[in-house]
Each structure stands twice: as C-alpha cells, then as structure tokens.
C-alpha cells in the first residue's frame, strides 16, 4: 500500500487533492471532480483505480473493465502482508475485503455493487434500467452475490464461521447447496437470455466464471471432487467462450491465470502479490 496523508474528511487535508476527469456515460463525455482518498499522496492517471489481489474477487472487476475497454490502473493489496487489514486500506473499505474500485464518485466496495455501477455508468454488459429483462438480470446478479458467493466464502473460510475442528463438517454441508445453486443457474442459462449467453458476455457471466474457477481450485487442501464443470453444460459453454475474449487474455497476462482459467483452471502464478 502507498503512504498515507490526512483523511479526506479532515480539515487538514491537502487543498489540491482533487482529480478532474472526462469520462463517457453513454454517448456523453462528463467532466467530474472527485476528492482523492486521503490515504494516498499520489494522483490517479486513469478514471479508475482497482485495488486488487491476484485471483481474488477483484478478478471479476478487472475482467469487466477490460471487456468495456475502460482505462484503469491497479494497486496491489498484498495479502501476504495482510494489507487488506491495514488502516490505509480500511479507509477505503472498512470491512477489509477485496476489491475496492476508486471512481470519480468515490471508492466503491462489494463486487456486485462495482459491477452494476460500471454496467449502468457505461451502458455495457447488462440490460439497461429500462429494458424488459432488467428485473431478471438483477435477481440473478444478486443471487450470484448474496447466495452463491456468500456460500463460497463459507466453503473457503469455514474456520471463520465455526471452530476449526468442525470446519470440514461445515464444508461438507455447504457443498450440496453450491451444487444446487449451479443447477438452478444452469437451468436459467439453458434459456439463453442475452445477459447469460455464450455469445454475449455480461458482468454476470464474468462474475460466475470467476466463482466457478475458484470452486475447482479452493480450498487447496480440501476435497474438490464435488465440483464437475460438465454437470452444468450451459454454464460450461459460457465459460468456454469467455476464455476466448481479449478481456480474459488480458487478465491471464496480468494475474498468471493459465491458458484455460475457467474450464480447466490452474493456480495463479502472478508477477506480484498472492492469491491467498
């Protein structure tokens, strides 16, 4: 993490810590001012800064930014040094979780919130608020966030929810739930709505691709045979197509994800930082 200075709401903050951007919303270029988070003394050179760790939830944000063709910069949150728990990072996200996206409107945390904000701001990778399919898209996006991803956290970090001696029992109980979640998502993908379709990437498909990648890999020291991509053929088709996208290739290069990061994933070998 970078050096700290006065907090953004402090009367002692530097009077010139403001950023001015021109960035597109729809077809209109909007100029925006944003007060810089006071924990940083440098200035962003792009309208977005992604605070990330390799192969973490920030991967979904990187993929969306790449697919939208948006300029952004990254700041590593080094998990080996527990930087997500530092005072500097908690100024951006008081929960100490990754990712955070700094924007001209301030920092955003929560993966689904960032994805939805980007999609609506830039009118890409999601149905518009006026579209008839918007309601269906929203319910499945938040299913992916509030149900699927929430249960994945229990699988990955069972010791945070129960005594360590009982962690394997908790994991065993959560796996059938995860299988059911994937089955209902696959049934929805069978109907091929434009926001859950092999030929039309969306913030939801990228989010799901990341989560399914992690199911195949983590926890590294636990049974993972319960997850079989072939059990969900319609989702498998989506993941296969996403691997051909330039956005995915950019993420592979940036985070060392291997040539088939979604359909046959390998552990990340990033140039910086650590996935765990």
Describe the residue ranges of each PLM region.
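Ser/Thr-rich, low-complexity intrinsically disordered segments
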Residues: 1-9
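Intrinsically disordered, low-complexity segments enriched in serine/proline and basic residues
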Residues: 22-32, 36-38
